[in-house]
Design a protein with these regions (language model features):
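Active-site core of metal-dependent hydrolases
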Residues: 151, 155-221
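Aromatic/hydrophobic pocket-lining residues that form the small-molecule binding cavity
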Residues: 69, 96, 146, 150, ...
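Active-site mouth loops of central-metabolism enzymes
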Residues: 54-67, 135-143, 188
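Divalent metal-dependent hydrolysis catalytic cores, especially in the metallo-beta-lactamase
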Residues: 52-58, 70-99, 115-128, 157-169, ...
Length: 221
């Protein structure tokens, strides 16, 4: 549909508005009728920092095609997520970088994907392998971070934005984080029972870090 209008409640005010669009652009936003035929809401699309796949498309799977990425992206947009960081989780580092490189090549081929996929989120393999903290990640391929990994990651994704999630208590984490922030990579720290002292040490780095409390699950026999 190249043009049209919709009456709905504005997400910020809850008041009815009438929105008109043409050729993919909003051309008018004005107060709407007090009584709406359909009680619906209108809001900007969301931006998600972690999308591992959608609509039957698993980004962790090898051999994805341009059509696969477009399918997932269009379904996300239909459901309210307009832009996102494509996320890969723990795997052997070489396999992870190969997969990331292929996904970047596909993304760079399409203006639609370049608009939607703002960057990349690498979650692992530098996480805790302790039971209850590795979640869906394979603890057998967890490893300690090294500045070499950071160089390889930046080489694969070029100047694209990238978010790297790691556990700060892993050996070599401080050096890897210093290297990461020096090349513009945002680091997200996930906590484990031994992370507090590591976080205090890392806090001296004068660059943005994102802190997140790791979801903890009780082990039930």
């Amino acid at each position: 549909m190249s043009e049209g209008e919709i009456c709905a409640r504005h997400y910020a005010t809850a008041k009815p508005v009438r929105l008109r669009w043409k050729a993919g652009k909003i051309i008018q936003l004005e107060p709407g009728p007090e009584r709406l035929e359909i009680d619906q809401w209108i809001a900007p699309p969301l931006m998600d920092l972690q999308i591992n796949g959608y609509g039957g498309v698993d980004f962790q799977r090898d051999g994805l095609t341009l059509e696969d990425l477009l399918s997932a992206t269009r379904q996300l947009r239909r459901d309210g997520c307009g832009q996102y960081l494509l996320t890969l989780i723990t795997d052997e580092w070489s396999a992870l970088m190969k997969r990331l490189g292929q996904l970047k090549r596909l993304r760079d081929e399409s203006p639609e994907l370049r608009h939607a996929i703002l960057g990349w989120h690498v979650e692992g393999p530098f996480l805790s392998a302790q039971p209850g903290f590795c979640g869906a990640h394979n603890p057998a391929v967890m490893e300690d971070p090294h500045p070499r990994h950071i160089r390889e990651l930046r080489a694969v994704i070029g100047n694209d934005p990238v978010l790297l999630t790691l556990a700060p208590e892993r050996a070599g984490a401080l050096e890897a984080i210093e290297r990461a922030v020096s090349v513009g990579i945002i680091v997200r720290l996930v906590s484990t029972p031994r992370a507090a002292s590591s976080v205090m040490t890392i806090s001296r780095i004068k660059n943005p870090l994102v802190m997140r409390r790791w979801n903890q699950y009780l082990r039930r026999e």
